[in-house]
């Protein structure tokens, strides 16, 4: 081979390696955006848990008092006669009756896979939910699973409303049976659009094959989480005249879902993980039925909340493994812990287990080993963040408990038609849109901080100052230098035009995405039970009204134990503002109305800020070739999703050799 040919080969090799490195850097950057945003969002929601925890810890007299809202919500919901009414629109003519058998499963799959007209009659929805709750109630907290008869078992992770992935699993692996048992490891709903169908199908599978389907509870089997992440809105939109009754049945299902499973007494299957204080013996003895919501504590007559058992449930639902030693609070999620390999070894030794299968985290390949293969993460929702963002997977374990992984991507035909560049463009656009929506929550603060570094009002600041502001304000821990060209397009290599960043946040595609989302305040007001629980805790004398003295007592306790976390003066002023009729007391209606008005004012202020900015400061010209306009158009086009009937055969899958993985 002559010298020129060798040089050409080396040049091509260098170019290819640089290209591959750039692709991998882009993939990792997008993944970090998705994951950090997901954890930051859950951290917001976990603040509600923290608030309850602080109140109960420092107001122990409240923990033994009955929460009237919760107490009345669960007394007889399974025994009452259905008071369901007819729904408007198309209701499919599919009859479900007890006992549920395989023919009913086939009927449900055929109904649900259709893009349109996939609503069951509400009486059949109630039938499935009621019977499932009654049956689940009889199960232990930790379900024993055995391969003695079947010689194998399949474990699925998070599905998050991805009905297409569930149908792919059933198509590839077969329906449950005595020779083909399944464990579904929580997080059936939220985020995806077909959460109700996923939940109903899983519960129907359980009713049809009770000895071959095991359902574990995840952290999203919780009405507080559902209020934030879309499932409650999904049920309301599909059954607008019966959603309250259906959601009450769903709460009953949640409270009786088992907390985990143990396979052949050697493998623990739980949704999140564990901490250094987790005890399976204690978990087995907990009355799980009182934990309708993990994020909202149960308050019952004369029975103070046991924080130890509450923490046990919280840790197995919310925790994640870490590479470093020790057990520390999970600051990314704001709940649960990070547990290291030493914690895993100790936990397995104490409980005589071989390894643990958990879910709770999206992984690029659908699964991941950690802690010397003693922790296996399985995630079954493919295309979770965006089309092509990740593969889903499930595990098949044989009688020797050797795991075999099956990877898949649902709706494969949609990605086959796309080039790699197009797939990466879709993932990147989805990541940027989610990030921009999150940034809009801090838009005013971003603008104020940018201007501090621009005293001459030139519209430009240094790259380091731009990155510093982005991190200090959002606290997302992202590689901002890599994102600068995306979030401030069209700027030079030395300075950043921060107005480009602000203009991007005001584009139609970002405003529409923000409107489709739900804030913590939205979720809190939508889930009035949380507000009622807070009200009842502060109402020390159980009079049905909060006096200024009672409010001040609660504030004093919080301020004393958490200095700097709360401003007493500001909170007292907020209490006075809640007193709408000026009688010196705040009743429940005033308490709820104050939250509604506060959220309404917040939204009106956002609209006013947009109008003010459009006229109050010089904006970058919006032309067809303007960088911000081009980026917004790219995001809008690349995040367009067309719905089709679900075809479970439309998938790509392969079996992974566990030795190679």
Swiss-Prot record:
Ca(2+) 2 binds at residues 579, 581, 583, 585, 590. Residues 441-476, 526-561, 566-601 form the EF-hand domain. The keyword Magnesium applies. Keywords: Calcium, Hydrolase, Magnesium, Manganese, Metal-binding, Protein phosphatase, Repeat, Sensory transduction, Vision. Its EC number is 3.1.3.16. GO terms for cellular component: cytoplasm; cytosol; nucleus. GO terms for molecular function: calcium ion binding; calcium-dependent protein serine/threonine phosphatase activity; calmodulin binding; iron ion binding; manganese ion binding; protein serine/threonine phosphatase activity. SMART domains: EFh, IQ, PP2Ac. Its cofactor is Mn(2+). The active site is at residue 220. InterPro entries: Calcineurin-like_PHP_ApaH, EF-hand-dom_pair, EF_Hand_1_Ca_BS, EF_hand_dom, IQ_motif_EF-hand-BS, Metallo-depent_PP-like, PPP_phosphatase, Ser/Thr-Pase_EF-hand_contain. Mn(2+) 2 binds at residues 187, 219, 271, 360. Signal peptide: none annotated. GO terms for biological process: calcium-mediated signaling; detection of stimulus involved in sensory perception; negative regulation of opsin-mediated signaling pathway; phototransduction; thermotaxis; visual perception. Mn(2+) 1 binds at residues 158, 160, 187. Residues 7-32 form the IQ domain. Residues 105-413 are annotated as: Catalytic. This is Serine/threonine-protein phosphatase rdgC. It comes from Drosophila melanogaster. The lineage of its organism: Eukaryota, Metazoa, Ecdysozoa, Arthropoda, Hexapoda. The gene is rdgC.
């Amino acid at each position: 081979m002559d010298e020129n040919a060798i040089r050409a080969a080396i040049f091509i090799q260098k170019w290819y390696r640089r290209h591959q490195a750039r692709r991998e850097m882009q993939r990792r950057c997008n993944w970090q955006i998705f994951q950090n945003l997901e954890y930051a969002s859950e951290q917001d929601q976990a603040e509600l848990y923290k608030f309850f925890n602080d109140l109960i810890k420092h107001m122990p007299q409240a923990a033994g008092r009955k929460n009237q809202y919760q107490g009345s919500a669960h007394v007889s919901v399974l025994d009452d006669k259905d008071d369901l009414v007819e729904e408007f629109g198309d209701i499919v003519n599919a009859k479900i009756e007890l006992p549920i058998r395989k023919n009913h499963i086939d009927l449900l799959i055929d109904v649900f896979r259709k893009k349109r007209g996939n609503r069951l009659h509400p009486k059949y929805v109630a039938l499935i939910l009621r019977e499932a709750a009654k049956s689940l109630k009889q199960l232990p907290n930790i379900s024993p699973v055995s391969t003695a008869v079947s010689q194998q078992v399949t474990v699925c992770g998070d599905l998050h409303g991805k009905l297409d992935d569930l149908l792919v699993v059933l198509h590839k692996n077969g329906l449950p049976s005595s020779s083909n048992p399944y464990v579904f490891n929580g997080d059936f709903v939220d985020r995806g659009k077909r959460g109700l169908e996923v939940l109903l199908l899983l519960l129907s599978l359980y009713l049809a094959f009770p000895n071959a389907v095991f359902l574990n509870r995840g952290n999203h089997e919780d009405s507080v989480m559902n209020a934030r992440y879309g499932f409650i809105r999904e049920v309301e939109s599909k059954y607008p005249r019966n959603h309250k009754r259906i959601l009450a049945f769903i709460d009953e299902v949640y409270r009786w879902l088992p907390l985990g499973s143990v396979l052949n007494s050697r493998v623990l299957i739980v949704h999140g993980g564990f901490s250094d204080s987790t005890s399976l013996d204690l978990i087995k003895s907990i009355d799980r039925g009182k934990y309708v919501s993990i994020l909202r504590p149960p308050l019952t007559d004369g029975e103070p909340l046991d924080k130890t058992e509450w923490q046990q449930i919280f840790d197995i639902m919310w925790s994640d493994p870490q590479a470093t030693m020790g057990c520390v609070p999970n600051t990314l999620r704001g709940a649960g812990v990070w547990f290291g390999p030493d914690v895993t070894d100790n936990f397995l030794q104490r409980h005589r287990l071989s390894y643990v299968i958990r879910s709770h985290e999206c992984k690029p390949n659908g699964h991941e080993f950690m802690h010397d293969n003693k922790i296996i993460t399985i995630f079954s929702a493919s295309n979770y963040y965006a089309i092509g963002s990740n593969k889903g997977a499930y595990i098949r374990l044989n009688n020797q408990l050797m795991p075999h992984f099956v990877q898949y991507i649902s709706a494969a035909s949609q990605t086959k038609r796309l080039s790699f560049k197009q797939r990466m463009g879709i993932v990147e656009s989805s990541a940027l849109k989610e990030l921009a929506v999150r940034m809009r929550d801090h838009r005013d603060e971003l603008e104020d901080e940018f201007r501090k570094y621009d005293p001459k009002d030139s519209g430009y600041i240094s790259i380091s100052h731009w990155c510093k502001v982005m991190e200090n304000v959002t606290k997302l821990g992202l590689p901002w230098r890599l994102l600068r060209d995306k979030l401030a397009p069209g700027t030079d290599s030395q300075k950043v035009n921060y107005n480009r960043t602000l203009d991007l946040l005001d584009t139609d595609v970002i405003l529409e995405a923000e409107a489709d989302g739900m804030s913590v305040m939205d979720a809190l007001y939508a889930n009035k039970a949380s507000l009622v629980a807070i009200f009842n805790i502060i109402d020390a004398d159980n009079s049905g009204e909060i006096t200024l003295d009672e409010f001040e007592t609660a504030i004093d306790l919080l301020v004393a134990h958490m200095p700097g976390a709360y401003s007493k003066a500001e909170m007292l002023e907020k209490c006075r503002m809640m007193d709408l009729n000026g009688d010196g007391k705040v009743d429940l209606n005033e308490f709820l109305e104050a939250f509604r008005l506060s959220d309404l004012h917040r939204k009106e202020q956002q609209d006013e800020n947009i109008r003010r900015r459009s006229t109050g400061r010089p904006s970058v010209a919006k032309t067809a070739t303007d960088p911000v306009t081009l980026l917004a158009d790219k995001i809008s086009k690349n995040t367009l999703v067309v719905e089709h009937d679900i075809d479970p055969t439309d998938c790509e899958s392969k079996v992974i050799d566990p030795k190679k993985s």
